[in-house]
């Protein structure tokens, strides 16, 4: 017996699909969750008069632009003018503050390859001028965010050829400082900065 719809067409059951489509993994926004949390936190700090900290823009030289419409421009070719230093800088309690923010899905360590030579040189110069310099590291698997002084990262970077190519999570647990995640501010890293650099 054929089952029919009210319009007379026969019912056709949906075919069971045996092929499972894998979702494409998008790596384009790695680090953007931490970055957006820090941007939101910095906005909170600025609004409440706690600190003036901003994300540094990456210097880009635009070479080729296409104008498909009058109101829209599409950048077709661009180059970095110079290597960028760290992600954020500003002033807090009369001291210069400079830091990098990085995220990893790795469960046991933080890869040193996420840093570049010019960033290490910049961090050394900030520390030499008695500035506050650190790295905020988020282990996304554990939803844990740490503040780690730049001196530890520089030391690990300088020994990466002879020793490890990563900083073990156990090292970050010992020498880093866990940052409490909340609502406002989202990533209250200044609370940790107070404890580490002003106590």
Swiss-Prot record:
It catalyses: Endonucleolytic cleavage at a junction such as a reciprocal single-stranded crossover between two homologous DNA duplexes (Holliday junction). One of its GO terms (molecular function) is magnesium ion binding. The keyword Magnesium applies. Pfam families: RecU (PF03838). It is an enzyme of class 3 (hydrolase). One of its GO terms (cellular component) is cytoplasm. Binds 1 Mg(2+) ion per subunit. Keywords: Cytoplasm, DNA damage, DNA recombination, DNA repair, Endonuclease, Hydrolase, Magnesium, Metal-binding, Nuclease. It is found in: Cytoplasm. Mg(2+) binds at residues 85, 87, 100, 119. The keyword DNA repair applies. Residues 1-24 are annotated as: Disordered. InterPro entries: Resolv_RecU, Restrct_endonuc-II-like, tRNA_endonuc-like_dom_sf. One of its GO terms (biological process) is DNA repair. Endonuclease that resolves Holliday junction intermediates in genetic recombination. Cleaves mobile four-strand junctions by introducing symmetrical nicks in paired strands. Promotes annealing of linear ssDNA with homologous dsDNA. Required for DNA repair, homologous recombination and chromosome segregation. Belongs to the RecU family. HAMAP family: RecU (MF_00130). This is Holliday junction resolvase RecU. The gene is recU.
């Amino acid at each position: 017996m054929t089952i029919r719809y009210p319009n007379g067409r026969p019912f056709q059951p949906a075919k069971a699909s045996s092929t499972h489509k894998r979702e494409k993994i998008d790596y384009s926004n790695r680090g953007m969750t931490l970055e957006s949390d820090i941007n939101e936190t910095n906005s909170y700090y600025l609004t409440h008069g706690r600190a003036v900290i901003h994300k540094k823009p990456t210097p880009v030289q635009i070479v080729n632009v296409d104008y498909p419409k009058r109101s829209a421009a599409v950048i077709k070719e661009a180059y970095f003018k110079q290597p960028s230093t760290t992600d954020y800088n500003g002033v807090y309690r009369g001291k210069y503050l400079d830091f990098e923010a990085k995220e990893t899905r790795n469960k046991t360590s933080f890869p040193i390859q996420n840093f570049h030579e010019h960033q290490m040189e910049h961090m050394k110069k900030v520390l030499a001028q008695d500035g506050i310099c650190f790295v905020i590291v988020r282990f996304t698997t554990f939803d844990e965010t740490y503040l780690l002084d730049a001196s530890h990262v520089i030391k690990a970077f300088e020994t990466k050829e002879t020793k490890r190519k990563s900083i073990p999570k156990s090292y970050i647990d010992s020498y880093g400082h866990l940052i409490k995640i909340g609502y406002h501010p989202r990533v209250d890293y200044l609370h940790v900065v107070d404890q580490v650099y002003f106590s």
